[in-house]
């Protein structure tokens, strides 16, 4: 006997395909990316249902997706809308590859424009103030000084520095090996001041009760997490009398300082672990006007 539920079943229902898409993402994407992609798909499904639009994959047309995008444009920032747009593109790309649809309803749809806004950087004076709060000789001060200098000197992401193991840091060659997005490992260089700070921290780390742990950074109860780094920086900002800084601003500042010192954009892209030049352009724009003014020479004076 066929039940009402069975008769209402639609093979290409977005609700059904969502579970299969989640399996696909779990095999190829990070957990955070998976959550973002599924949230975007769930929001689209909810919109289609609320508007009485088709919820079977083959019935969804461009105008249905555009209706959702238009609504979200009024609700979220351009960067968030762009992220959701790309997430939905990935879903329809997957559905096309799996023969669930004959063509993507997002085919030839243009991604929402994200205005290029300069990312905030930390001035050298403010970083010195931040570092001055770590001038003590105890374990916490030595650890925090090493952490701040390493992030400032290399531009590594918070998650990358949190994932460091003791064996990943080579003081002699002043190199650290970090694992970035997608599990890609790269080597980053640091300077002599950072090497000295790391050495001072490691000497005190040997006496820590969790010293046998592989994790490079240790708190009172064991390895530090990325969220703990944000708390450390926030605490140091208060001590220095500075506005709260986000750990990613150290990455922004590294990019700016590297270009300001004459570094090449292609080299910076490799050092920072960016797979797309789009991020490079955004970071490089942070102080591009300042660099342009500094490099200005008067054509009249050359007459």
Question: Language model features by range: what are they?
Answer:
Residues 1-303:
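Conserved catalytic core of the tyrosine transesterase superfamily
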